[in-house]
Amino acid sequence: MKSSNLMNGYFNSHWPVECGGNRRQKIFYGSLNVANKTHHLTTKTNNRWNVMFIFRDNNEVYLTGTMPNFLGDKPFGWVKKVNPDNLETICESPNLECGEHIWCGAIAAHVNGTIINVNGSYMHVLDENCNILKEIKLPVDQAHNGLLILSDGSVVTKDIRVSNSVTSTLTRLNPESGELIGQPLKLPEGSMGRIACDIDDTGEYIYCLLYTSPSPRDPSI
């Protein structure tokens, strides 16, 4: 089931965020238009950590990732707009600061037309040509791997913890100014998985996979 309210914060696209939407159902809305078509495989190698594709407008495909620099050169995040037919780069962002944290990050197409990217301990707001509009240092100095846009357009992200020795935190931000909306919410445990979201008549809910227990179903989150 598709909820129009749940996706109000995203660009009007069939795949504006990882897994296609906040419920992470990986459902494609509309026709794939593959009947009577010929299969064609294109492979590109760039020696980078390629994380995910999203779609913005028709035939606007964006790829995000980071660098697998666990040793040696300082790592950085990046976003590029690619040709959907041959995967050639149309435009690419400058190197995106990640606070020297290496993890896969996330990307989304916002309803205001911008591209939101979270990588390491930074969030970047980019225009459709991958130019940096705003760089935001997140309040938690840790790699982040969760990114959702809520129905009001605000952005929520979560830091990742590879063990339960330190708790994770949910941070909500204004997509225009980059300012915090409320104080970051410290979860009761660490969380390695990504976050999901759903909405009903009583509120909008964020779900976090914790190490030993599920997150509370609390609309104040």
Region spans (language model):
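A short loop-to-beta-strand structural motif that recurs across blades of beta-propeller domains
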Residues: G77-K80, Y122-H124, S168-T171
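Single conserved hydrophobic/aromatic residue that forms the stacking wall/gate
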Residues: Y211-P214, D218-I221
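Residue-level detector of Asp-centered blade-edge/turn motifs that repeat once per structural unit
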Residues: R56-N58, A109-N112, I149-D152, I199-G203
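A short beta-strand motif characteristic of beta-propeller blades
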Residues: T38-K44, E88-E97, I132-K137, E179-K186
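Beta-strand-rich domains and repeat architectures in extracellular enzymes and scaffolds
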Residues: N8-Y29, N33, K37-G77
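Short, solvent-exposed loop/turn segments at conserved positions within beta-propeller repeat blades
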Residues: F70-P75, V118, V162-T167
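Short loop/turn segments that connect beta-strands within beta-propeller blades
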Residues: N83-N86, D127-C130, N174-S177
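Repeated scaffold domains used in trafficking and secretory/extracellular systems
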Residues: R48-F53, E100-I107, V140-I149, G190-D198
